[in-house]
A protein has these predicted regions:
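Short, conserved micro-motifs composed of acidic
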Residues: 3-4, 66, 81-115
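Short, conserved catalytic/metal-binding micro-motifs enriched in Asp/Glu and His
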Residues: 18, 44-49, 75, 118-126, ...
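Catalytic palm subdomain of template-directed nucleic-acid polymerases
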Residues: 48-73
Length: 430
């Protein structure tokens, strides 16, 4: 560089960094680290994990300490340095025990922890998922907090995309693994999504969850986790998973005997002694698969299978036209549509007003009265009818929801006219 040559140096160990081949060469370089080890080993990039399951604490100490000696010898031979101070151990036990195994790596005692993050999942020594869900909720609430501050400055479509891109993936990372979480943890996840849905749609807390999800086109997270487990089972059934995953499952019943049964394609269920094991990924996924109709199981592709299993009744085409309009007017339109607006009928139904009568007369101020009958808005009503004259006859459902029988441009024409009417009426607080 600039007529200056760098000095040559030899590389005694390791692989060059920054190249496409670097990760592959590194994997080849460390691939034999697990040879001759007495316990199960998992390698992922530059992370290594040892697993040992026994009924004897002394046996566990002997096996793992022997493995650490082999790893130390391997690292010395191949000039790869490990940091024993960063090595952690997590001890799972379904019995109350007062002591942990005594483990040493390069003459350094290994620290036992209550929680450890492994490939994005926080594992806890009591085998529950409270800590993991606490962490992902903390991350997700930060983004939802930002969404709340931008509720009236960003469009509905932008807020919807932020949630789907930056929040829901956090809430669903490896969710089939921790779906056996407590009811309280599952409820906390749903509360976060409900709040995000209210921010996106602009609806108030008086809106039912059924209307809220119908408005935004989402499903509950628990239903999505259930569907993801069923899709996971489809991959297992069709040998679309690695062998180490397939080995976790019991045989199908047609492999256990020679005679034909109606449920031959079912997986044999695990005999579960504890609720903890019963709610874990594999034992809880098998009954979901076995309950499916044979025609669904025999779908020719994963996409076809998903279309049959994961059909979302809330994901209606109208949700796209619900994105239309300036943010404030779009919110007012959505609130009228879902019965949580400042119309007196909605306020009365939500216990925020003593009566539901309109200020113009003794008629009840419903959405239909507001758009079609109230004498206070006769002039702007003529403008509404004039703009939508090509789509007459009008009705309240057409004004609030549009129609799947109309193309997008015609629905936009209706929504534009309705939102201009809302703006000109000056009926709602800004």
């Amino acid at each position: 560089m600039q007529s200056t040559e760098s000095k040559l140096q030899s590389v005694s160990a390791g692989v060059p960094q920054g190249s496409v081949l670097g990760p592959l060469l590194f994997l080849l370089y460390v691939n034999d680290i697990s040879d001759n080890l007495l316990s199960l080993t998992r390698l992922y990039a530059d992370d290594s994990s040892l697993f040992c399951s026994t009924t004897s604490l002394r046996d566990m100490e002997g096996i793992l300490n022997h493995n650490f000696q082999l790893i130390s010898a391997w690292s010395e031979r191949w000039l790869v340095n490990f940091n024993p101070n960063k090595t952690e151990a997590l001890f799972f036990c379904n019995k109350n025990t007062q002591s942990n195994p005594v483990l040493r790596f390069d003459n350094t005692p290994i620290n036992f922890v209550q929680h450890h993050k492994h490939l994005g999942l926080t594992l806890s020594n009591n085998c529950n998922w409270n800590k993991h869900i606490e962490i992902i909720l903390g991350s997700a609430w930060k983004v939802v907090g930002i969404m709340r501050k931008m509720k009236f400055s960003l469009s509905r479509q932008a807020l919807n995309q932020i949630y789907l891109s930056y929040v829901r993936p956090v809430l669903e990372y490896s969710s089939i693994v921790w779906d056996g979480c407590t009811v309280q943890s599952s409820h906390s996840l749903e509360l976060l999504q409900n709040e995000a849905a209210r921010i996106v749609t602009g609806l108030t807390r008086s809106t039912s969850l059924e209307n809220l999800y119908s408005e935004c086109g989402w499903e509950s997270l628990s239903i999505r986790r259930r569907n993801q487990k069923i899709c996971f089972m489809y991959k297992v059934y069709n040998n679309l998973v690695p062998s180490y995953v397939d080995d976790l499952f019991p045989h199908q019943r047609n492999l256990e005997h020679s005679y034909q049964l109606r449920n031959n394609d079912d997986f044999s269920s695990y005999r579960t002694r504890t609720t903890l094991f019963k709610k874990s990924c594999v034992p809880s996924s098998i009954p979901l698969w076995n309950s499916l109709d044979t025609n669904i199981r025999n779908s020719t592709s994963l996409s076809a299978f998903k279309n049959k299993v994961c059909s979302n009744p809330n994901k209606i085409s109208s949700s796209h036209r619900f994105f239309y309009g300036k943010r404030y007017l779009s919110i007012m339109h959505a609130r009228i549509r879902n019965g949580c607006s400042d119309l007196n009928f909605d306020l009365h139904n939500n216990h925020l007003r003593e009566n539901s009568y309109c200020a113009c007369s003794e008629n009840i101020e419903t959405a239909e009265h507001f758009f079609f009958r109230c004498i206070k808005y006769n002039t702007i009503r003529l403008v509404l009818f004039q703009k939508t004259r090509s789509l007459h006859p009008l009705n309240i459902n057409l004004l609030l929801y549009g129609s799947d029988n109309l193309n997008y441009n015609d629905n936009v024409l209706i929504f534009n006219a309705v939102q201009e009417f809302i703006k000109s009426s000056d009926r709602f607080k800004h």
